[in-house]
Amino acid sequence: MKTPTEVGQIAEDLITTYCTSAGVETPDDVRKACELLISKAARAIEKYNGHPKSVEVLSRTMSYVATNPMPAGGVQ
């Protein structure tokens, strides 16, 4: 697998393409589209790693987002 930095950039590019392809126009559209993407990703993790691991990943992600808000300008 590529480095975390490389994979992070690939994810950013894919999310941009996904949102554009989905016809996202508003911040609420971004939320809805990304929520569906998060759900699909969690199910993919569950399919190959099991339900407990999927829940663990979602919990870890929730904790990280809750304690590390984006800086002004939205660049992480």
Task: Please give the residue ranges for each predicted region.
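Solvent-exposed interaction surfaces and binding hotspots enriched for charged
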Residues: 1-76
